[in-house]
Amino acid sequence: MTMYVKSNTTGKDMLSLLEWNKEELIDIIKLAVAMKTNPAHYSHILSGKILGMIFDKPSTRTRVSFEAGILQLGGQAIVMSSKELQIGRGEPIKDTAHVMSEYIDAIMIRTFSHEKVEELAYHAEIPIINGLTDLHHPCQALADLMTIYEWKDQLEGVKLAYIGDGNNVCHSLLLAGAMVGLDIRLAMPKGYEVDETILATAENLAKESGAKIFVTEDPKHAVTDADFIYTDVWTSMGQEEENAKRLADFGEKYQVNAELASIAKPDYHFLHCLPAHREEEVTAEIIDGNHSVIYQQAGNRLHAQKALLAAILEAK
């Protein structure tokens, strides 16, 4: 077997990033860059491997990037929803996990409850990948780190401002940044802060890595001299009934626009995990402008997840 990361990560889950250490994450990022540069070299390393994908939430980037990724590595994908499985009719997750482990080599699941993913991982004998839950979005964070690394050729000390809702994307970005040494500034209104336990975990990780974490209600304090400005939608899937209140609570103050971006570094880059609501969390001028790298960032979902698959499956 060829080792594609320095440590033996075969069989590891990816649930929240916390199953991995700094060195392993950086290895994945560097492998992702190598795969992007020379995809043909890796085109058969997962020959014969099957990835099962379970979707309880709509998906564009997660589904297409994972399905294309396993195919580009020589493997295959089976796409399912819980409604198509007996789990949707009440079969215990324990039984589903054990049975799936007899058929396929890994499961990627995109669902609402993070506890559901943890229970699946507890019972399964194969690696489980969190493709998004209400609490975490680790695969997005891998693509985010890769994009930052491509532009800066480093991660430590890079200044990243996140403006908006303290949601799953923010949680994973915060943990990832704390692990690798980013200078992270979060700006969000009261009532939309990040989970307290996740923030405390990130602060402990930052002590080990040298990362900096600064939380404020003032977007201008966060964005000042930033290398990257990141935002996400103010209303996530399942929160549609709260949309009017959320729009009012965030308002123009938390919108990434030309005025706010003007206090970042002159060569800053704009990030967004997509889908985006133009003229809400970000203006069209910014997201479609020269500083925006959102399509590179979205494209890196493919490469980062290919590297993850190579790391957790027994690549040839």
From Swiss-Prot:
UniProt keyword annotation of Transferase present: yes
EC number: 2.1.3.3
GO molecular function: amino acid binding; ornithine carbamoyltransferase activity
Gene Ontology BP, a term: arginine biosynthetic process via ornithine
Pfam annotation, one family: OTCace_N
Main enzyme class: transferase
Binding site for L-ornithine: 168, 232, 236-237
Substrates-to-products reaction catalysed: carbamoyl phosphate + L-ornithine = L-citrulline + phosphate + H(+)
Cross-referenced SUPFAM superfamilies: Aspartate/ornithine carbamoyltransferase
UniProt family annotation: Belongs to the aspartate/ornithine carbamoyltransferase superfamily. OTCase family.
Protein name, UniProt field: Ornithine carbamoyltransferase
Organism annotation: Listeria innocua serovar 6a (strain ATCC BAA-680 / CLIP 11262)
